[in-house]
Regions:
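C-terminal functional modules
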Residues: 16, 36-177
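A small/polar active-site loop signature that marks catalytic segments
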Residues: 1-36, 40-45, 49
Protein backbone atom coordinates (compact mmCIF):
# COMPACT_ATOMS: atom_id res chain seq x y z
CA UNK A 1 0.00 0.00 0.00
CA UNK A 2 1.48 3.33 -0.98
CA UNK A 3 1.49 6.51 1.11
CA UNK A 4 -1.45 7.95 -0.83
CA UNK A 5 -3.60 5.05 0.33
CA UNK A 6 -2.43 5.41 3.91
CA UNK A 7 -3.65 9.01 3.90
CA UNK A 8 -6.95 8.14 2.20
CA UNK A 9 -7.74 5.58 4.92
CA UNK A 10 -8.36 8.22 7.63
CA UNK A 11 -10.67 9.99 5.15
CA UNK A 12 -12.64 6.77 4.87
CA UNK A 13 -12.73 6.36 8.63
CA UNK A 14 -13.67 10.02 9.08
CA UNK A 15 -16.43 9.61 6.50
CA UNK A 16 -17.91 6.79 8.53
CA UNK A 17 -17.69 8.88 11.72
CA UNK A 18 -14.61 7.40 13.37
CA UNK A 19 -13.42 10.69 14.80
CA UNK A 20 -10.13 11.77 16.28
CA UNK A 21 -7.83 11.86 13.27
CA UNK A 22 -7.00 15.57 13.45
CA UNK A 23 -8.51 16.54 10.11
CA UNK A 24 -11.56 16.38 7.93
CA UNK A 25 -12.53 13.72 5.42
CA UNK A 26 -11.89 16.32 2.70
CA UNK A 27 -8.39 17.18 3.98
CA UNK A 28 -7.37 13.51 4.22
CA UNK A 29 -8.93 12.75 0.83
CA UNK A 30 -7.10 15.59 -0.90
CA UNK A 31 -3.83 14.82 0.89
CA UNK A 32 -4.09 11.18 -0.23
CA UNK A 33 -4.75 12.16 -3.85
CA UNK A 34 -1.82 14.61 -3.77
CA UNK A 35 0.51 11.93 -2.39
CA UNK A 36 -0.64 9.45 -5.02
CA UNK A 37 0.05 11.98 -7.78
CA UNK A 38 3.48 12.68 -6.25
CA UNK A 39 4.38 8.99 -5.93
CA UNK A 40 3.49 8.44 -9.58
CA UNK A 41 5.21 11.61 -10.81
CA UNK A 42 1.88 12.81 -12.20
CA UNK A 43 1.13 16.46 -12.88
CA UNK A 44 -2.11 18.42 -12.63
CA UNK A 45 -3.30 17.46 -9.15
CA UNK A 46 -4.82 20.89 -8.45
CA UNK A 47 -6.93 20.78 -11.61
CA UNK A 48 -7.89 17.18 -10.85
CA UNK A 49 -9.04 17.96 -7.31
CA UNK A 50 -11.06 20.94 -8.61
CA UNK A 51 -12.81 18.87 -11.30
CA UNK A 52 -16.56 18.86 -10.60
CA UNK A 53 -17.57 17.56 -14.05
CA UNK A 54 -15.54 14.46 -15.03
CA UNK A 55 -17.31 11.16 -14.31
CA UNK A 56 -16.48 7.58 -15.31
CA UNK A 57 -16.67 7.20 -19.08
CA UNK A 58 -18.64 4.55 -20.92
CA UNK A 59 -16.95 1.30 -21.97
CA UNK A 60 -17.13 0.46 -25.67
CA UNK A 61 -16.56 -3.22 -26.48
CA UNK A 62 -14.39 -3.29 -29.60
CA UNK A 63 -15.10 -6.96 -30.28
CA UNK A 64 -18.71 -7.61 -29.35
CA UNK A 65 -21.71 -5.65 -28.22
CA UNK A 66 -21.05 -5.81 -24.49
CA UNK A 67 -20.92 -2.05 -23.96
CA UNK A 68 -21.43 -0.57 -20.51
CA UNK A 69 -22.39 2.86 -19.24
CA UNK A 70 -21.44 3.56 -15.64
CA UNK A 71 -24.20 4.84 -13.37
CA UNK A 72 -21.65 6.47 -11.06
CA UNK A 73 -21.57 10.25 -11.19
CA UNK A 74 -18.75 10.69 -8.69
CA UNK A 75 -16.21 13.36 -9.66
CA UNK A 76 -12.67 13.89 -8.36
CA UNK A 77 -13.62 17.12 -6.52
CA UNK A 78 -14.71 16.67 -2.91
CA UNK A 79 -18.32 17.57 -2.12
CA UNK A 80 -19.07 18.35 1.52
CA UNK A 81 -22.81 18.25 0.74
CA UNK A 82 -22.73 14.74 -0.72
CA UNK A 83 -24.28 11.95 1.29
CA UNK A 84 -22.36 9.23 3.05
CA UNK A 85 -22.41 6.78 0.13
CA UNK A 86 -21.26 9.39 -2.41
CA UNK A 87 -18.38 10.43 -0.15
CA UNK A 88 -17.40 6.82 0.49
CA UNK A 89 -17.54 6.07 -3.25
CA UNK A 90 -15.32 9.08 -3.98
CA UNK A 91 -12.77 8.02 -1.34
CA UNK A 92 -12.65 4.37 -2.37
CA UNK A 93 -12.46 5.26 -6.08
CA UNK A 94 -9.34 7.30 -5.37
CA UNK A 95 -7.93 4.54 -3.16
CA UNK A 96 -8.56 2.07 -6.01
CA UNK A 97 -6.64 4.33 -8.41
CA UNK A 98 -3.81 4.86 -5.90
CA UNK A 99 -3.50 1.11 -5.28
CA UNK A 100 -3.04 0.25 -8.95
CA UNK A 101 -1.61 -2.27 -9.87
CA UNK A 102 -2.23 -4.04 -6.52
CA UNK A 103 -5.22 -6.07 -7.70
CA UNK A 104 -5.86 -8.03 -4.48
CA UNK A 105 -6.07 -4.79 -2.46
CA UNK A 106 -8.51 -3.28 -4.97
CA UNK A 107 -10.59 -6.46 -4.98
CA UNK A 108 -10.75 -6.43 -1.17
CA UNK A 109 -11.90 -2.80 -1.16
CA UNK A 110 -14.55 -3.58 -3.77
CA UNK A 111 -15.83 -6.53 -1.74
CA UNK A 112 -15.74 -4.52 1.49
CA UNK A 113 -17.44 -1.36 0.20
CA UNK A 114 -19.00 -2.08 -3.20
CA UNK A 115 -16.86 0.68 -4.73
CA UNK A 116 -15.74 1.66 -7.23
CA UNK A 117 -18.44 0.68 -9.68
CA UNK A 118 -17.06 -2.05 -11.91
CA UNK A 119 -18.32 -3.53 -15.16
CA UNK A 120 -20.51 -6.54 -14.37
CA UNK A 121 -19.70 -9.97 -15.72
CA UNK A 122 -21.33 -10.44 -19.12
CA UNK A 123 -21.42 -14.24 -19.16
CA UNK A 124 -21.65 -15.81 -15.72
CA UNK A 125 -20.62 -19.48 -16.01
CA UNK A 126 -20.80 -20.26 -12.28
CA UNK A 127 -24.04 -22.26 -12.47
CA UNK A 128 -25.64 -19.88 -9.99
CA UNK A 129 -22.94 -20.02 -7.32
CA UNK A 130 -21.78 -16.44 -7.98
CA UNK A 131 -24.15 -13.47 -8.17
CA UNK A 132 -23.48 -11.58 -11.42
CA UNK A 133 -23.90 -8.18 -9.76
CA UNK A 134 -21.90 -8.98 -6.62
CA UNK A 135 -19.21 -10.82 -8.58
CA UNK A 136 -16.62 -13.18 -7.07
CA UNK A 137 -16.46 -12.74 -3.28
CA UNK A 138 -13.69 -15.21 -2.43
CA UNK A 139 -11.51 -17.93 -3.91
CA UNK A 140 -12.59 -21.51 -3.11
CA UNK A 141 -10.17 -23.73 -1.23
CA UNK A 142 -7.60 -25.38 -3.47
CA UNK A 143 -7.39 -29.13 -4.01
CA UNK A 144 -4.06 -29.25 -2.14
CA UNK A 145 -5.54 -27.38 0.83
CA UNK A 146 -8.46 -29.82 0.94
CA UNK A 147 -6.00 -32.77 0.93
CA UNK A 148 -3.41 -31.36 3.35
CA UNK A 149 -5.73 -29.54 5.76
CA UNK A 150 -9.05 -31.37 5.57
CA UNK A 151 -10.18 -30.48 9.11
CA UNK A 152 -9.25 -26.80 8.68
CA UNK A 153 -11.07 -26.66 5.35
CA UNK A 154 -14.14 -28.34 6.86
CA UNK A 155 -14.14 -25.79 9.68
CA UNK A 156 -13.75 -22.92 7.21
CA UNK A 157 -16.54 -24.19 4.96
CA UNK A 158 -18.80 -24.54 7.98
CA UNK A 159 -18.06 -20.92 8.95
CA UNK A 160 -19.01 -19.91 5.40
CA UNK A 161 -22.44 -21.48 5.81
CA UNK A 162 -21.47 -24.72 4.11
CA UNK A 163 -20.56 -23.23 0.75
CA UNK A 164 -17.04 -23.42 -0.71
CA UNK A 165 -17.89 -21.29 -3.73
CA UNK A 166 -16.71 -18.03 -5.20
CA UNK A 167 -20.04 -16.52 -4.20
CA UNK A 168 -19.78 -17.27 -0.47
CA UNK A 169 -19.18 -14.08 1.50
CA UNK A 170 -16.43 -13.87 4.11
CA UNK A 171 -17.20 -12.70 7.66
CA UNK A 172 -16.26 -9.07 6.92
CA UNK A 173 -18.09 -8.94 3.58
CA UNK A 174 -21.43 -7.67 4.86
CA UNK A 175 -22.55 -4.98 2.38
CA UNK A 176 -25.57 -5.97 0.31
CA UNK A 177 -23.95 -4.97 -2.98
Amino acid sequence: MDDGCRIVLPACRRCITWLGYGGTAKSFYEQGVRMSFEENNAAGVDDYLADHTSTPGAFADNVGSDNYTFSSRVTPAWDDNAGFEAQLERIITQKWIANYPDGPEGWSEYRRTGYPEVIPVVRNSSNGTIDTQLQVRRLPYTRDEKINNASGVASGISALGGKDTGGAKLWWDKKSR
